[in-house]
């Protein structure tokens, strides 16, 4: 169906004359992203956004956000979604799934109708914030009101906002069900129902909530499911709640082609030393370091700070306002390194991240796939390094087999061409709010000399309070500096194997 639509659209291209394209010249476009892209996003049919016959105001938002041409998942999804048909779409992490459902949702929303017309469900609060910002940015010329609502925030604020017109609601299932059950959120005319990361949303903890939410929608709703992985429970949902869905599967392989994967065998007590060595050898723009528990997240963040590196951390037990601040500031390039639990494995799109480190190796292939997908976003290059101990050997083999991928032993030196770009200033922060940008990732890659001379300090709560006592009042962010050497992963001309050296440095992150 998508190929037939593409053929028809190619026969009737819009915007071929000067009058039609002149409006483009008035747009305020961001700097062009000149990085090489893989076939994950370049293997398209050659369609343009104009070929979808969408509103000019929407196209203005699309181009001003830095989009140039639709990716494969967008080419397949958008024309079908615009017809109102149910969709079940499977595509890799970081290939443009969010825009694939946001664009048709915005196009089909009528700003003149003062009712909620679309509901977008996501599994985590951070992903809700990110997705709502995508909606607002792409739809900024449409006059559409977008609201984000998640648990961990005041219900009264949501009630006040819903007293005004809200066209699109983005949020987590529990909070939206609470609002709908109380009669605060009126979903009686909400004809678009979208689930991102659908495999997670249809897990046993969420499924009853999802089915209750559907009961508040009209019978003739459009249901769209998007994910990188679809377990059997998704088929059960499809058979029960979807009408002849159009199925899209772009998963000819599971892992992104631009991500190079390595493992290093290392004793548990030497992991922090190994991480320190990697920081000094790799040219990191931004990195995400994953741990398997919230306790280890905080312990590792503290240890990294004591080594002299700037570091934020985030996990599910933190206050929501602190999680939001960490996510916002890391996305805007305030800090180079983020330690987190699997809270941020789902859908989070920070294009400046070029290195992911599994400090703790994940227990299953699904988690591994989502973790390493935080680098190599939208067809770009990235590096995934796994610190493996003796007990992880079987999981390493099992994950390789399940994903059909090869995780190689880490070499004495890693070619920068695998994950570093010569012009880091071109790396965009998609959907960033220019008024809140502080220190972009491009500057991160160039400002180590200034940062090396900063005094080590811990930021408690907001960024205004600083204290030299790193060990107390931990609330989501550590900042560190070192008087000498490199900070945050700058290259040295030392080609020794990061795994070859040993240290007796004590660590607070030994396995429990």
Curated annotation (Swiss-Prot):
<dbReference type="InterPro" id="IPR000629">
    <property type="entry name" value="RNA-helicase_DEAD-box_CS"/>
</dbReference>
<dbReference type="GO" id="GO:0000932">
    <property type="term" value="C:P-body"/>
</dbReference>
<dbReference type="Pfam" id="PF00271">
    <property type="entry name" value="Helicase_C"/>
</dbReference>
<dbReference type="Pfam" id="PF00270">
    <property type="entry name" value="DEAD"/>
</dbReference>
<keyword id="KW-0810">Translation regulation</keyword>
<protein>
    <recommendedName>
        <fullName>ATP-dependent RNA helicase DHH1</fullName>
        <ecNumber>3.6.4.13</ecNumber>
    </recommendedName>
</protein>
<keyword id="KW-0963">Cytoplasm</keyword>
<keyword id="KW-0813">Transport</keyword>
<comment type="similarity">
    <text>Belongs to the DEAD box helicase family. DDX6/DHH1 subfamily.</text>
</comment>
<dbReference type="InterPro" id="IPR014014">
    <property type="entry name" value="RNA_helicase_DEAD_Q_motif"/>
</dbReference>
<dbReference type="GO" id="GO:0016887">
    <property type="term" value="F:ATP hydrolysis activity"/>
</dbReference>
<feature type="region of interest" description="Disordered">
    <location>
        <begin position="429"/>
        <end position="512"/>
    </location>
</feature>
<feature type="compositionally biased region" description="Polar residues">
    <location>
        <begin position="433"/>
        <end position="450"/>
    </location>
</feature>
<dbReference type="GO" id="GO:0051028">
    <property type="term" value="P:mRNA transport"/>
</dbReference>
<dbReference type="GO" id="GO:0003723">
    <property type="term" value="F:RNA binding"/>
</dbReference>
<feature type="short sequence motif" description="DEAD box">
    <location>
        <begin position="196"/>
        <end position="199"/>
    </location>
</feature>
<keyword id="KW-0347">Helicase</keyword>
<keyword id="KW-0694">RNA-binding</keyword>
<dbReference type="GO" id="GO:0006417">
    <property type="term" value="P:regulation of translation"/>
</dbReference>
<feature type="short sequence motif" description="Q motif">
    <location>
        <begin position="47"/>
        <end position="75"/>
    </location>
</feature>
<feature type="domain" description="Helicase ATP-binding">
    <location>
        <begin position="78"/>
        <end position="248"/>
    </location>
</feature>
<keyword id="KW-0507">mRNA processing</keyword>
<dbReference type="InterPro" id="IPR011545">
    <property type="entry name" value="DEAD/DEAH_box_helicase_dom"/>
</dbReference>
<keyword id="KW-0378">Hydrolase</keyword>
<feature type="domain" description="Helicase C-terminal">
    <location>
        <begin position="258"/>
        <end position="418"/>
    </location>
</feature>
<feature type="compositionally biased region" description="Polar residues">
    <location>
        <begin position="494"/>
        <end position="512"/>
    </location>
</feature>
<dbReference type="InterPro" id="IPR027417">
    <property type="entry name" value="P-loop_NTPase"/>
</dbReference>
<dbReference type="InterPro" id="IPR001650">
    <property type="entry name" value="Helicase_C-like"/>
</dbReference>
<dbReference type="GO" id="GO:0003724">
    <property type="term" value="F:RNA helicase activity"/>
</dbReference>
<keyword id="KW-0067">ATP-binding</keyword>
<comment type="function">
    <text>ATP-dependent RNA helicase involved in mRNA turnover, and more specifically in mRNA decapping. Is involved in G1/S DNA-damage checkpoint recovery, probably through the regulation of the translational status of a subset of mRNAs. May also have a role in translation and mRNA nuclear export.</text>
</comment>
<keyword id="KW-0509">mRNA transport</keyword>
<feature type="region of interest" description="Disordered">
    <location>
        <begin position="1"/>
        <end position="24"/>
    </location>
</feature>
<dbReference type="GO" id="GO:0005524">
    <property type="term" value="F:ATP binding"/>
</dbReference>
<keyword id="KW-0547">Nucleotide-binding</keyword>
<feature type="binding site">
    <location>
        <begin position="91"/>
        <end position="98"/>
    </location>
    <ligand>
        <name>ATP</name>
    </ligand>
</feature>
<dbReference type="InterPro" id="IPR014001">
    <property type="entry name" value="Helicase_ATP-bd"/>
</dbReference>
<dbReference type="GO" id="GO:0006397">
    <property type="term" value="P:mRNA processing"/>
</dbReference>
